Amino acid sequence: KTFDVAIVDEATQILEPQLLGLLCARNVVGNNAIGKFILIGDHKQLPAVVLQSESQSEVCEECLQSIGLYNLKDSLFERLYRTVSANHSSPTTQRFYDMLCRQGRMNVEVARFPNHAFYGGLLEAVGLPHQQGELVLAPGLENDEFADVLVSRVAFLPSVPETPSQSAKINHSEAQLTA
């Protein structure tokens, strides 16, 4: 089979070896089976899950570094974005990527933090009803020590970091705070 376009969603969470079959796919006459790829993702959100440390996944070969492959934990999306944005001053590279600026998932209060911390204030709320609703405190919790936190969409509760010998996937202190 041959496809004009392959759309890869959440591409920042997919490592290159996982895409290799698609990237190298050939049709019966030996031509590319996929005409072009569209990678959709957000390099400022969750990366691919890799259990190796930064040093274990580091690329040392100069020939691979010359194509922007510095760490095996980076997705193809991240590598291509880094390469193109490094040459952003060129008019031809500006057409390779864009940013969706309207979001319809998060409540406006929740979106405020990532909008300013990661997106330079470029995100706009679509204005859907669920983005504007107020939080109501459940009956019986009016005197709870965390009542003000429970009606806030965003709060910071400091936690104790886990010791390096424990799994990076578990933080008992954070679990206790949220339970």
Positions of predicted regions on the chain:
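Conserved helicase motor core of SF1/SF2 NTP-dependent helicases
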Residues: 1-179
